[in-house]
């Protein structure tokens, strides 16, 4: 329809005697295919390595756009990625970082990888490297192994705290974090799995279950709210649930999650809210960006009180 309209305008403008109107279209410029795709980033900081994630896409004739996930926070759109030969750069507004400046990224292609420097909103600059994210697609449904109960009756065996202090306790199989503090991480790592978890939170509290330590399924007091990718049962910053199936705060609730490669299905309180959708990359707060490797389960404990019970994981054989 648009092309026909343009042709008609050309005919009218050139006069009836011009029986062969032409349309001028700017030529496409070459796009460096080495940049396009998803990248797992590792940032070198004085406090150790920190994970991030970058997606670069070709838009239109010669533009690059994308998404970025920082050390924490949700996926942010990148309206323009400047590519000049082997180099790239972009700048985006701050989100949850310290400081009020932009987050600015500079980098260059180095063989099959990327490397560069990242300046945070507080003005501090760190070096980073990135490898192409593994696809992890096309996997058949695996044969499942035996279910593993991850909680002991009265101790934290099989788990460790991510911080210097630990506020988590287990009494009679009830795992509790009475206040904001450290996250809790399984000692064991998993690849593909099915997970059953039961949880309870007080009003306005927040937690999350990180699959392989990299992909957060949000736990939050969202009873009565519309769906969003940062709300109850969403994959934080990436995938919105079809509905919010949350119960009122103070009640026990359940997730049944299946993760095969990047494909995730989430059943919240008996209702399927995400059906075999792709998780594009790591979410903010991930332990690392090594997406091709098995990883632990971790429970977010730094956003308010929360209780868990009956955590059962069934790994693929």
Report each predicted region and the residues it spans.
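Carbohydrate-interacting regions of secretory-pathway proteins
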Residues: 20-26, 34-38, 44-57, 61-317
């Amino acid at each position: 329809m648009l092309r026909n309209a343009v042709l008609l305008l050309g005919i009218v403008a050139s006069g009836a005697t011009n029986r062969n109107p032409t349309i001028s279209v700017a030529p496409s410029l070459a796009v460096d295919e080495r940049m396009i795709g998803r990248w797992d980033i590792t940032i070198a900081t004085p406090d150790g390595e920190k994970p991030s994630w970058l997606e670069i896409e070709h838009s239109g004739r010669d533009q690059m756009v994308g998404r970025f996930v920082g050390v924490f926070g949700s996926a942010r759109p990148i309206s323009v990625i400047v590519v000049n030969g082997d180099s790239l750069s972009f700048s985006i507004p701050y989100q949850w970082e310290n400081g009020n400046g932009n987050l600015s990224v500079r980098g260059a292609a180095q063989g099959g990888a990327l490397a560069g420097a990242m300046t945070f909103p507080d003005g501090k600059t760190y070096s980073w490297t990135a490898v192409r994210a593994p696809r992890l697609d096309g996997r058949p449904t695996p044969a499942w192994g035996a279910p593993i109960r991850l909680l002991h009756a009265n101790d934290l065996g099989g788990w460790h705290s991510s911080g210097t202090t630990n506020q988590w306790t287990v009494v009679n199989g009830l795992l509790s974090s009475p206040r904001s503090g450290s996250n809790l991480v399984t000692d064991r790592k998993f690849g593909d799995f099915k997970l059953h978890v039961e949880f309870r939170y007080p009003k306005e509290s927040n937690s999350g279950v990180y699959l392989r330590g990299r992909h957060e399924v949000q736990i939050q007091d969202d009873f009565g709210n519309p769906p969003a990718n940062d709300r109850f049962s969403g994959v934080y910053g990436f995938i919105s649930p079809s509905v919010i199936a949350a119960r009122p705060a103070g009640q026990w609730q359940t997730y049944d999650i299946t993760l095969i490669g990047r494909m995730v299905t989430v059943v919240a309180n008996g209702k399927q809210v995400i059906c075999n959708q792709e998780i594009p990359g790591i979410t903010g707060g991930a332990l690392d960006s090594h997406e091709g490797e098995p990883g632990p389960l971790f429970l977010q404990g730094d956003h308010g009180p929360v209780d868990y019970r009956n955590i059962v994981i069934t790994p693929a054989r």
